[in-house]
């Protein structure tokens, strides 16, 4: 529901309300009961990070991805987001190399290696596997 509200709130140039809905969605997702298969189709944190990154909020996107990696140790999606943030910053080559190595290991068995942490990002499909 929060993802839907965020999409509905996303005006062409002001994503403040959309980001607020996604942040609330992240908070709510932390209290979901554990189940397998996972009850979320798309983790809200991955959506928030991708859209923050896309809108140039690199530092906050990086915080989102670091929190995701802390919660779900070295997961491919969190590592991808952190890798993109570190590439954009360009000031941490050693950490970028380490994160890239981990991402490559974690994504080595994926059918499709994603370019973004959410295909909802505007340029996610432009750089996809299927071009």
Where are these regions (language model features)?
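"A position-specific structural signal for the A-helix of alpha-solenoid helical repeats
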Residues: 2-4, 47, 81-84
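Structural motif corresponding to the intra-repeat A-B loop/turn of tetratricopeptide repeats
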Residues: 5, 12, 55, 89-90
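TPR-repeat structural position
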Residues: 15, 58, 75, 92-93
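Single-residue signature of alpha-solenoid repeat helices
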Residues: 18, 61, 95-96
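Amphipathic alpha-helical segments of tetratricopeptide repeats
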Residues: 23-31, 67-70, 104-108
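Terminal, low-structured helical/coil segments at or just beyond the last alpha-helical repeat
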Residues: 93-131
């Amino acid at each position: 529901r929060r993802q839907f509200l965020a999409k509905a709130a996303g005006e062409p140039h002001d994503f403040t309300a959309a980001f607020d809905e996604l942040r609330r969605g992240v908070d709510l997702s932390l209290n979901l009961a554990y189940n397998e298969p996972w009850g979320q189709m798309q983790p809200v944190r991955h959506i928030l990070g991708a859209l923050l990154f896309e809108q140039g909020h690199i530092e906050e996107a990086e915080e989102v991805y670091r929190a995701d990696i802390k919660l779900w140790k070295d997961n491919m999606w969190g590592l991808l987001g952190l890798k993109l943030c570190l590439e954009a910053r360009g000031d941490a080559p050693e950490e970028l190399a380490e994160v890239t190595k981990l991402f490559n290991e974690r994504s080595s068995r994926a059918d499709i290696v994603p370019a973004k942490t959410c295909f909802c990002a505007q340029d996610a499909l432009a750089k996809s596997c299927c071009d």
